[in-house]
Amino acid sequence: MKMDENELSNYKKAASITTSVLKELKIAPGMSVLELAEKIEKSIESKGGLPAFPANISCNEYAAHDTAAVGDTRKIGEKDVVKIDIGAHVDGYISDRAITFDLSGENGKLLEASEKALNNAVSIVKAGVNVEKIGEEIEKTIRSYGFRPVENLTGHSLGKYLLHSGVEIPNFSARGKGAILEEGDVIAIEPFATKGIGIVVETQRTEIFSAVFELPTRNVAARNMFKEIKEKYHELPFAERWVANSFERKVALRDLIKNGSIHSYPVLKEKSNGLVSQFEHTVIVEKDSATLLI
């Protein structure tokens, strides 16, 4: 189903923001991860949008869901492979983008593999295509470079205030009941290429969360925090550093996580510690092609 002009306008505004932020982005060894994340998020706001999720800064074997912690002292390393995954929304309509920087200058082919896979995948998107075909194209491209796709990370459909709205876009030749794309669908395609075995696992570190639904708690501060989070972020992911700036609020957040009101997104790491690259675009599915939102 075709979207209305207001929806399309907001998607385009969000896309212009993420494109502008990424074009202006400079990554160098020694940069503070915390300062970089805050700079990206403030830049999104200064351009008229809001962050759709915390700026993800995932280095080397860390593939996804990594953002700065409160008081984070980490620095970008001299030879890091740095994945920057950002999202902006305008009235809930989201643009989701990612690029990778190779500070060593030694991993160009790894970056090329995921970027080429993205371009090839976008080229076959149209109404009526099974998402399995997209996964096949991504895997074929990445393997042609001698690398593996990360099989348990996927692209996804987008909805208003929904970063993941139900449809998964595989990054490998999945066999099963893949969804059929329809005209007007908005999807984020994000191939991950790796020198490792192609599987990510959860780590013990978590900085990103999202509201699910409110469950009973005796903690008044926790109840108030949940209402605040829902009003401000809806179901979109948020960072602990955005909401828990005091001991009381940290305790409140932990109570909400413990009782299931808040969902956690642990940092994901390639299982064999292989380097990972990522590129991502948001596209609108059209009758005979796809519109790249840039």
Model regions and ranges:
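Active-site neighborhoods and metal-handling regions in enzymes and metal-associated proteins
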Residues: 1-294
